[in-house]
Amino acid sequence: MLSFQDMILTLQRFWIKHGCALMQPYDMEVGAGTFHESTFLRAIGPEPWRAIFVQASRRPSDGRYGENPNRLQRYYQMQVVIKPSAPDLQALYLQSLYAIGIDPATQDIRFVEDNWESPTLGAWGLGWEVWLNGMEISQFTYFQQVGGIECKPVTGELTYGLERIAMYLQNVNSVYDLIWTTTPDGVLTYGDVHQQNEREQSFYNFEYADIADLCAQFDAAEKMSLLLAQKKFPLPAYEQALKASHLFNLLDARRAISVTERQRYILRVRALSKAAAEAWYETRAALDFPLCRQQGIEK
């Protein structure tokens, strides 16, 4: 039986073997792996890109004080990003499942059409959910637009729900019972690593995050992001947009914004993502799209 740690390592080795560069987690609070710069920014423009990474993702509203066996405010996604998209991406995905002990020939694996959209990122794509014996474990997306910019070429993105897959492999009903790894001191569980954090962060997300302070921080991040994008510094501009996005999610968890205000906040974050995306494209174009030049690819 694979531990949570060994499952991740096995998937990483699989995709490295198939030409992906191993990236490290983004050191920002993000709502999903798609927010990582290796996905969002690298999907823009003609330059090729092949990467795999694990990203801790935060959704404050999903916290349950560490008491729900399946709901987390912080969890892990593994993303594979291939641009231009590989024609055999689905077959490779099924092979990766086999590598961790899930045999597609004996399990009920279904691809259920589910086109993807992220309003705050100004992004959408054609996609499918992957269901294993009735449980969603992954998402395929072929990006059509990111930051309001059409994707040429199309980027293929594959997202693994690591906790769900591990719960199936280890046959446990609570995420906190997952075996993270075995050390010389004994078994280390997911709960040992993260349950206290789930409890404490839920108190912060739902009860103690200062609403006025969150609003002020959002305004400051928005202002700085727009300034940096205007100055053609897309990477720090994008990081400020990510800060604004997380602050919006905290305000949402605190129930501090109405339905109408919520839509306005989404549009404000979307404008930041779009400005950063446009600045990224322009700066890479000014550099003559260096990854295209290095690999002799026609722009």
UniProtKB/Swiss-Prot annotation:
Oligomeric form and interacting partners: Tetramer of two alpha and two beta subunits.
Catalytic reaction(s) noted: tRNA(Gly) + glycine + ATP = glycyl-tRNA(Gly) + AMP + diphosphate
Superkingdom of this protein's organism: Bacteria
Keywords of the record: Aminoacyl-tRNA synthetase, ATP-binding, Cytoplasm, Ligase, Nucleotide-binding, Protein biosynthesis
Species for this entry: Dichelobacter nodosus (strain VCS1703A)
Entry GO MF terms: ATP binding; glycine-tRNA ligase activity
Compartment annotation: Cytoplasm
Keyword Ribosomal protein carried by entry: no
Source taxonomy: Bacteria, Pseudomonadati, Pseudomonadota, Gammaproteobacteria, Cardiobacteriales
One GO-annotated biological process of the protein: glycyl-tRNA aminoacylation
Annotated protein name in UniProt: Glycine--tRNA ligase alpha subunit
